[in-house]
Every structure is written in structure tokens, then in C-alpha cells.
Design a protein with these regions (language model features):
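Conserved structural position within tetratricopeptide repeats
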Residues: 9, 13-16, 46-50, 81-84
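Register position in tetratricopeptide repeats
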Residues: 34-35, 68
């Protein structure tokens, strides 16, 4: 768990220099998922998607986090969009 907290601190620092970096926002979301902080993770994935709307890793991450907090309809939309963008990379969303 400590490594995720350390990573989050590094993401915060990196975003001061690159606030429009979708990959960093997405990585922060992944770290929050690992810490089971799903609502915060959704916020970070959504920020990544504001920067880069078709960023498949953020769509899947957001879908997973939304599922974890019971927002299954919204999650389904994220998975659907990801599958439309990258049908060959579609993860199982059930």
C-alpha cells in the first residue's frame, strides 16, 4: 500500500509540470483503485478523459471503479466506448 501512496505523491508533482498529461491522471486513478478509493479514482480517470476523451486505459479504469461503487450503467457506457475505440483490446466488462 505504501508504494501506491508514494506513487500518488509523484503523480501530484508530475502534474504540476504536465497538468494535461492523461497518462499521469490515469496512473493516479489506477493507484487509487489499488487502495480501494474508487470514488477518487473515478475523478482521476474522468480528468484523464477530459484531457484525452478516447484514452482507452482511462475508460476501462473508470468503468472498473464505477462498477466497484455500484454505478453500473455509467460503467457500461465507459466499457462500450472503449470497445468501440479499440475492439481488439476490449477487456471483459462483466
Amino acid at each position: 500500500m505504501e508504494q501506491y501512496q508514494e506513487a500518488i505523491e509523484k503523480f501530484k508533482e508530475a502534474l504540476k509540470q504536465q497538468p494535461e498529461n492523461a497518462e499521469i491522471w490515469c496512473s493516479w486513478g489506477v493507484a487509487l483503485v489499488e487502495l480501494q478509493q474508487y470514488q477518487e479514482a473515478v475523478e482521476k480517470f474522468e480528468k484523464a478523459l477530459e484531457v484525452k476523451p478516447d484514452f482507452v486505459p482511462a475508460l476501462y479504469g473508470c468503468g472498473f471503479a464505477l462498477t466497484a461503487i455500484g454505478r453500473k450503467e455509467e460503467a457500461s457506457e465507459k466499457f462500450k466506448k472503449a470497445k468501440e475505440i479499440a475492439p481488439d483490446n476490449a477487456a471483459e466488462s462483466t
